[in-house]
Amino acid sequence: MLIIELLKAIFFGIIEGITEWLPVSSTGHLILVQEFIRLNQDKAFIEMFNIIIQLGAIIAVMLIYFERLNPFQPGKTAREVQLTWQLWLKVVIACIPSILIAVPLDNWFEAHFYFMVPIAIALIVYGIAFIWIEKQNAQQEPAVTDLARMSYKTAFFIGCFQVLSIVPGTSRSGATILGAIILGTSRTVAADFTFFLAIPTMFGYSGLKAVKFFLDGHHLDFAQVLILLVASLTAFVVSLLAIRFLTDYVKKHDFTIFGKYRIVLGSLLLIYSFFKFVF
């Protein structure tokens, strides 16, 4: 029944909207949830669905930060316009590693890593990394506390960290936030740049998935279009709340709690995978 599929789409949209911006891996969570709750659709559609619904989350970022990211915003001074263009150039530079490395390798990683055990291991490894990095930085003041002071070189290396998210369970936001902190930015700068970097990265990735879907001879019927729209709209609404939460959270707290969450979830998944294999 279509109504059941739409309810599932809403549920998946909620998962996407929450986990896309928290450093816990949205794709990993969607794959995990679909182990128990699946759309009654073919594999090709589900793989495309997991990526396309990220567009709702991206539109939420564009809405929240529209004035800041718009170089043509009325009332901006010449200096503010210059800084906006410089920010976009940093974002473009940070996309280069993904274009050169992640895009060519995407199909291979999708074929070999999109199942439970690699996701669980990635959750645990990066959970440990978050806790360790936060402990190392506890007594250190960040060198970069404003995006305007972040160098193009730093932006490029943050983009290199983003490539790590090609492994499901890593988290794109987690990899870039972790990388930015290692490179000396404050948590606020790390979170903001992660939001901005997501716009071209995820638009591009979603576009590639959509093109591949149609080039492979697939098509969308009315029900599938409706499922995509409902899930994306839900992800958009939930993302508005999740982004606000994270931007407020990082002003007062570190990312240790997310590291602990990742370790617990990853461990439970390994146990689940073991019993599933045995029984």
From Swiss-Prot:
One Gene Ontology CC term in the entry: plasma membrane
Localization of this protein: Cell membrane
Keywords: Antibiotic resistance, Cell membrane, Cell shape, Cell wall biogenesis/degradation, Hydrolase, Membrane, Peptidoglycan synthesis, Transmembrane, Transmembrane helix
Membrane topology qualifier: Multi-pass membrane protein
Database matches in InterPro entries: UppP (IPR003824)
GO biological process: cell wall organization; peptidoglycan biosynthetic process; regulation of cell shape; response to antibiotic
Record EC number: 3.6.1.27
Leader sequence residues: none
Chief location: membrane
Pfam family, one: BacA
Transmembrane intervals: 2-22, 44-64, 85-105, 113-133, 163-183, 188-208, 223-243, 255-275
Annotated catalysed reactions: di-trans,octa-cis-undecaprenyl diphosphate + H2O = di-trans,octa-cis-undecaprenyl phosphate + phosphate + H(+)
Domain of life: Bacteria
GO molecular function: undecaprenyl-diphosphatase activity
Family the UniProt entry places it in: Belongs to the UppP family.
Additional notes on this entry: Bacitracin is thought to be involved in the inhibition of peptidoglycan synthesis by sequestering undecaprenyl diphosphate, thereby reducing the pool of lipid carrier available.
PANTHER family attached to this UniProt entry: UNDECAPRENYL-DIPHOSPHATASE
Function: Catalyzes the dephosphorylation of undecaprenyl diphosphate (UPP). Confers resistance to bacitracin.
Record-given protein name: Undecaprenyl-diphosphatase
Species this protein is from: Streptococcus pyogenes serotype M49 (strain NZ131)
